[in-house]
Amino acid sequence: MTTRYKLTMAYDGHLFHGFQIQPNQRTVQGVIEEALKKMTKGKRVVVHGSGRTDAGVHAKGQVIHFDYPGKEIPAKNMMLALNALMPIDTVFFESEIVDEDFHVQYSTKGKWYRYVVDQHRFTDPFNRFYTGHYPYPLDISLMKQAAKDLIGEHDFTSFAASGGQIVDKVRTIYYVNITPDPDKKQIIFDFIGNGFLYNMVRILVGTLLEIGNKKRPVDDIPRVLKAKDRQEVRTTAPASGLYLQQVFYEDIPKKYRLDLKKD
């Protein structure tokens, strides 16, 4: 008999080779499974994640599930036990016992990704692993105008890196917001959608930065979407600025449903 646990966690991704377990690499899935192995006296417990963040990508709201063998442990105690065994660049902060038909990947209603751009002239040595550096002039109003063309259901083939195994490239973006933080000299990009393709958020950010820097026309996104060609947008923002903020398992709040307000 097993018990299915759902836990929400945060991690600093810069010393991880991504989420998914890989031979001879430090991964988020790997360190969780090592902790669980200590709790089960050597028995492997397979961990499932809501998504496979790449090397260097961070999470503030990654969700995992696993089936724990043996006696049921209260959800809070499971979280406390795992935190005691996990490295200091990870933390679990929510936990619950769920039904066997719950799956962290297939039960999702949407995801929220955030990208943080550092606008200092030179790379900040203390933030270089947590932001994407872009020291060039940016017109925020142009980026906001262009971002409206991303809202709704589109084929995002042009914004997907090669190497992904997913054939269907149609996704719906519910919400895009671009917020400057003058005090920190940062720009925050937020994207909420029903799903995202391989490197999609980083490519979207790279494209919007080109528009903000006037290297690409403000009305270019509809043309790029229609082209369905990755060669149309070659700039990919660095992994260091990307955060998985939240995974939604209930309907997306209406305040984030800009697609419903689009003409």
Swiss-Prot record:
The active site is at residue 54. GO terms for biological process: tRNA pseudouridine synthesis. Substrate binds at residue 113. It comes from the Bacteria. One of its GO terms (molecular function) is tRNA pseudouridine(38-40) synthase activity. It catalyses: uridine(38/39/40) in tRNA = pseudouridine(38/39/40) in tRNA. Keywords: Isomerase, tRNA processing. It is an enzyme of class 5 (isomerase). Its EC number is 5.4.99.12. InterPro entries: PsdUridine_synth_cat_dom_sf, PsdUridine_synth_TruA, PsdUridine_synth_TruA_a/b_dom, PsdUridine_synth_TruA_C, TruA/RsuA/RluB/E/F_N. Gene3D superfamilies: Pseudouridine synthase I, catalytic domain, C-terminal subdomain, Pseudouridine synthase I, catalytic domain, N-terminal subdomain. The keyword Isomerase applies. Formation of pseudouridine at positions 38, 39 and 40 in the anticodon stem and loop of transfer RNAs. Homodimer. Belongs to the tRNA pseudouridine synthase TruA family. This is tRNA pseudouridine synthase A. The lineage of its organism: Bacteria, Bacillati, Bacillota, Bacilli, Lactobacillales. The gene is truA.
